[in-house]
Regions:
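Catalytic cores of nucleic-acid endonucleases
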Residues: 43-91
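Residues forming the ATP-binding cleft of Hanks-type serine/threonine protein kinase domains
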Residues: 19, 42, 100-101
């Protein structure tokens, strides 16, 4: 996956892909120096169209899935985490929004 390769070139370590639980699915979980990045990947004709596809309900599911991930991995709930969104447009260009829901 292009997005995974992009993050790994930047020094991130892939922890999980398509991690599933009853709360939802996380596309990618990546470890960076001081945080876990939970990543949602969206593809559409344009980057803005891809971002528009993420609503409040999906954000809640991502957050709940992230909490379930921390519990499953026995990580403390005060672990430094962030939520990134990667969008791919129709020609395969990647845009990353770090801390997208802050």
């Amino acid at each position: 996956m292009q997005v995974t390769a992009h993050y790994m070139r930047c020094g991130y370590i892939l922890e999980a892909e398509r991690w599933r639980c009853p709360s939802g699915e996380i596309d990618l979980v990546l470890q960076c120096k001081n945080a876990l990045a939970f990543l949602e990947v969206k593809q559409s004709k344009t980057h803005s169209m891809a971002l528009e596809r993420i609503g409040a309900r999906q954000i809640d599911r991502l957050y709940n899935a992230a909490m379930a991930y921390l519990a499953a991995k026995q990580l403390p709930f005060d672990t430094n985490i962030r939520f990134d969104v990667a969008t791919l447009d129709s020609i395969g260009t990647i845009e990353i929004v770090e801390n997208a829901f802050a």
